[in-house]
């Protein structure tokens, strides 16, 4: 379980980086939404998650429990029941062709990053250099936290298992990683070095993101992420591949699942809002999407 969780947290951090690309103009201040409308015999629910969070901040409220209880199946970003998922995650995080990020860093930047990793994680780039920068960034995000990270994905998967409900995925691991891989390596590396140079500022920024998430204010959350000092550069140019295209690809999956049986959908909060977000796309198709909490 520990290895599985580490792999998932690596990917979770990557997705957190991806969320920084979009400023969501959310009209509704909520994370949980009820979906009703044409072809839906019973309501389904959407929940916006934050991929890296402390256990004390992971709140499974009564409305969430009810939504999960009313659902007959659960959809997360990935199929958590897939036994090959852990191995696939580990492989997807590795640099291609045996490359090492050491080859891509200046001597000074290498020293800064190597020292940071040794101090925070007791291992340096000799061990971590074979990871893609965006994968290493996800591990570095965990060093900013005062806890062992918890996961909404794992929690919802465990709740579903306890209730003998099937867990399915909105997309494949390959599709998710293909979107993340469109972020240039140079930008990814800059984010790593910037965080290593300014760890206190990075920790403060991350804490602010979590605090804003807990207010359920999606617009403010995405604004905070978009202004991140540690995204490595202007990520807005990759908004289409990281969020909008994925939202559009998810829509028919969501529609089909919700028509078959009441479903609880949980995915990164950044996918909920704005004109290309899941909420707007569903409303454009004639569904009623109502904020719950």
Language model regions located:
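Bacterial N-terminal signal peptides that target proteins for export
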Residues: 2-11
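Sec/Tat signal peptide C-region and signal peptidase I cleavage site
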Residues: 21-26
